[in-house]
From Swiss-Prot:
Record region (Disordered): 285-310
HAMAP family: Rel_fac_1 (MF_00093)
Species: Chlamydia muridarum (strain MoPn / Nigg)
SMART domains, sorted: PCRF
Protein name: Peptide chain release factor 1
One GO MF term: translation release factor activity, codon specific
Location(s) in or outside the cell: Cytoplasm
Post-translational modification: Methylated by PrmC. Methylation increases the termination efficiency of RF1.
Amino acid sequence: MEVKVLECLRRLEEVEKLISDPNIFSNPKEYSSLSKEHARLSEIKNAHESILAAKKILHDDKLALSTEKDPEMIAMLEEGIQGGEESLERLSKQLENLLIPPDPDDDLSVIMELRAGTGGDEAALFVGDCVRMYHLYASIKGWQCEVLSASESDLGGYKEYIMGVSGTSVKRFLQYEAGTHRVQRVPETETQGRVHTSAVTIAVLPEPAEDDEEVFIDEKDLRIDTFRSSGAGGQHVNVTDSAVRITHIPTGVVVSCQDERSQHKNKAKAMRVLKARIRDAEVQKREQEASAMRSAQVGSGDRSERIRTYNFPQNRVTDHRIGLTLYNLDRVMQGELDMITTALVSHAHRQLFGHEETN
């Protein structure tokens, strides 16, 4: 890792020289690219300096402990050493993630589709909990979320919830959320205190950029139907045919949207989801054909693959793909997902480049 850090520090010096050249402003695209690279390399430099500082403090504390005689001071130093070692481990993992080479698609917006699986109303309630978790995570990361479609259940959860997420490194950290999420807890309606198991399926679809030539949809291949939106009743039920259903005839992909009162807005949202699903289908097809690439991923990404279990009675969350178990489910549900997502990104990178330790 030290060799990679030194390479990055040398590259940072080069980038700083390039950015300081006044002629760079005549090429906005190049300047933008260098600015992003400078920001990433600066993060690596700061993380490396933090590690060096933490190592020095740890070294000094251990040196002091070796000669200390006072029991109170010994206890303080031992506590400081333990905290310092934990901090050093955390900083090292942070640096390891920063050293992962950026993927051109890292910053792509994604569309997340959450659906209630087995478990009926309890599964729908957990969809609602997951929606809240991802919104909180997005807030922590400085991302933007947009509701594209939502189908509420009778008890306040969601049968289906589709959201768009945009921001820096969105795809990088959310792509491994695809799969089946299993929840084990006692439902509020359970009178005997028995633990029930439910499931939620999540799809994560990278949203094609506007200039993405890979996804071309011919208007002639679309069938667009409009209908009256259905709601829970009352004054907010739309009396016009504002809901939109779009069918892509060649693939059979169907997308409906009725959240907006404007037919035009519903159509625009439905088209975004449609493009993402068609792009995803093409990517899945290519990856299935390239088995070598598939084996280098964290799990298959198949929506039927059970990837994670949330056990509320034990306050435990387990990601089955990398064998990671944490006993802080309460914090995870409050949006502190980085401890899982960063581990998944690191694992995927090690597999891809053949650095995975052999058992």
